[in-house]
Amino acid sequence: MIGNYNYGTGRRKSSVARVFIKAGSGKIVVNDKPVDEYFSRETGRMIVRQPLVLTDNLNRFDIMVNVAGGGESGQAGAVRHGITRALIDLDAGMKPTLKAAGLVTRDAREVERKKVGFHKARRRKQFSKR
């Protein structure tokens, strides 16, 4: 499989995606399922295709993705980040376009940890005056 593929690793929240790109007809396969079947929501599919639409490469590459961890939104973001990195690995000339759209930067936002004495990360226990 390593043959003539370009590779990119994408991360978002707790999801990690390994993306392999090669010249082809535009098929996107995520965990052995077509992208339309894997991501049930339209927003997830739009997020995944965003770097390809921006660079006018929607039907020029076959993409194979292995993604693990997190939920649907995090996985879609991780796949997008991986596709972006793989496209830059393939052709560095695409980087300014992708960078201007904010797709090259890894979204570093993570879930804030729950603190002791709180219900959640910031939700305090109810205060009783008496």
From Swiss-Prot:
SUPFAM superfamilies in UniProt: Ribosomal protein S5 domain 2-like
CC terms in the record's Gene Ontology section: cytosolic small ribosomal subunit
Keywords linked to the UniProt accession: Ribonucleoprotein, Ribosomal protein
Tagged with keyword Transcription regulation: no
Disulfide cross-links: none
GO biological process, one term: translation
Entry-linked Gene3D superfamilies: 3.30.230.10
Domain of life: Bacteria
Record carries keyword Transferase: no
Gene Ontology molecular function: RNA binding; structural constituent of ribosome
Similarity remark: Belongs to the universal ribosomal protein uS9 family.
HAMAP family: Ribosomal_uS9_B
NCBIfam families in the cross-refs: PRK00132.1
Protein's name in the database: Small ribosomal subunit protein uS9
Lineage, broadest ranks: Bacteria, Pseudomonadati, Pseudomonadota, Betaproteobacteria, Nitrosomonadales
